[in-house]
Amino acid sequence: MLFEKQIYDYLRGMVSIPSVSNTPQEKEVSDYIAGCLERQPYFAKHPSLCGQCALEGDSLGRTVVYGLVRGKGAGTVVLTGHYDVVDTDEYGRFRALAYDMEAWKHIHGEELEALKSMLPQEARDDLASGEWLFGRGVNDMKGGLSIGLAIMDWFGQKVLEYPETTGNLLFAAVADEEAYSAGMRGAVSLFTGLRQEYGLTYDCLVDLEPSFNEGGKQQVYIGSVGKTMPAVLVQGAKAHVVECFHGLNAIGVLAEMFMATELAPEFSETFEGEHCPPPTWFNLRDRKYGYDVSVPLRAAGYMSMLGFSKTTSQVMERLKEMGRRSFASYMKRMESQEALVRSGNILPKVDLEHCVLEYGELAEICRKKKGYGKWYQDLYGKIESDVRTGAMNYPQATLEMMDAMLTFSGITSPVMVISFAPPYYPAFHSDRLGETDRAGRTGGIQAGGIQAGEGTRLYNLLQKAAEDTCGLCLGKRNYCCGISDLSYCGGPDREEMASYAVNAPLWGTMYRMDLDAMADFRVPSLLFGPIGKDAHQMSERVHARSLLEEVPVILQQFIEQMFANT
């Protein structure tokens, strides 16, 4: 089956919709994708097997678009990807080009020269070659979704023509991957529901994210890095600037924490020669909302922390130790500085007691206070409203919750409170699904369990399909460090999720996961899609041959091999 025109048409339609994360246009593109599925012959005959599953409590009305082609047996391959994109600010006056693939082919003269002046040289060369398609989302990742839709149509028609065809193919397009992955978090419940309803066994999931070439090999990931976002709130001791040595500047303590953690090598894990990027802070500032001549009482910030295997409990314990050292280091600095500038105007050193608390410990203190229940409901509701209207993002809302809880607690002495802000991405590796976790499971709930090394086996099968169909050589990578929805395919154990939830101020209706569904959804997964370049940039593009010819037939062969072995 030739896929070129079908994939191109699907992609052009999707790209034309500016489905930026957390905007109403996400729902618009999900409706478009649902329409594409509904018009396919298989779903025209079996309309109950495709549809849209609403994300619970989502103010934008976003959905998971899905379709299930049912053959014989329980074995199932899942194709998935996200339909949201990042904004197009960097396009400037050429913003219209972001959503019009065809326009890139027809721009000429002075306009073409002006456009080229905004592109790096490699992108100019690729544009001139005619071998690449440009536009927002062609690479990340509407190109992959377009392939997925075409593959669904191929397999659906195959089942219609040959009802005895073995295997099931499930397609799911999700929202919000570029922000908080609300779509994939919601999709897990859909996947578990479909499995129970139709008796499916999920043998493999392919996230159709773009690939890249390295050393002449198209790279395939069998895992995805984990991510937490620790948020830190420091309360010092207020003092007039004239008496600065009598107080404790919260910014100073937070700065010590920043220096201890920013790009810290101890958090950079290594796995089979691959290195995880170290932590980096996204935000750091005082909590003063006006001007006065006192040292800041409070300061706060949040950082991104990636990992291959470390748990949220391990992260929290290490950060608490660093917090204690940050207090000690800054207070020692105050002593040495005071000795250098001592005069008659400087007050004697005051020894300040201090502590470091997990958010869960602060919340426990607050729960014992009179009137906490009603006060907390009002606070949570107000902040949730601000998040829904866009007045705050999740990390900002986390800091607001922490600040309000600390005030309600009545704690007036210096303290550091550490929590987790959304989003949370558990580390995932397909080869490690067979390992026993803390809950004693080995390989999940599917019949026969999941064998250790399953990701490598699937990669080898994909490699064979690439060689047989296109003569291509693939390369295996363990972890995608760019964050992906694969994080929700590994069934993190309930104990670890509970450890995260108790220290996440927004946990509840603002940010949630179906813990039972997540714990039970364990499927070997791959990241594999068309070759692309410069995601999130004006020069974003996808290789036409990879998109329209190579990846579709590789996946076609891979799926047939998967079902031939069941």
Which residues does each predicted region cover?
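Short glycine/serine- and small hydrophobic-enriched flexible loop segments
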Residues: 149-157, 256-263, 556-560
